[in-house]
Amino acid sequence: LSYEAINKLSPEILLRILERIIMVASGSVYPAKRTKVEGILSWLSSENSIRAKTLGGVVIRKRKDYVIFYRELKGCQTSEIVYPLTSRYLTWDNRFYIKLNKSKKLEVRCLGDEGVSIMKSKKILKKQGLSNIPLSAWKSAPSLWSKKRLISVPSLGYCVADDFKIYLKSVRQP
């Protein structure tokens, strides 16, 4: 969300946008309490030294020209582990639908610290993250694992097998 939008849009529109972004990022079916979202909007609209806050399982982080929103790792880590199928999409973390093109015994879980370390060792993620997205945000990204082996991180375009496809789509649209 750009500061330009924050400065141009009416408070009511911004509150609705923030509610929806937080719902999408958290996987919640209900919006956060309006008073809490109003507090976030007030914080975003003011000059202060606080760089990040959380609400409803979402980290809201101020950057130079925009604000980013991403799932808190602790909420993501408690999500039920899903074993994707080839026949239909399964929901993971109330945020993503996942399906495979081949039957494999894989589990979907957040990338976490271990996965981020692997991605850094392969030079896919840098010390600061990737594409202006911090490492802390990548930790909550969906990934596929075979026991302790990282097989795929769809959002990073990483997969150990060329003939293996993962179909990933958002549960909710912003």
Q: Model-derived features: where do they sit?
A:
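AMP-forming adenylation/ATP pyrophosphatase catalytic core
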Residues: 1-174
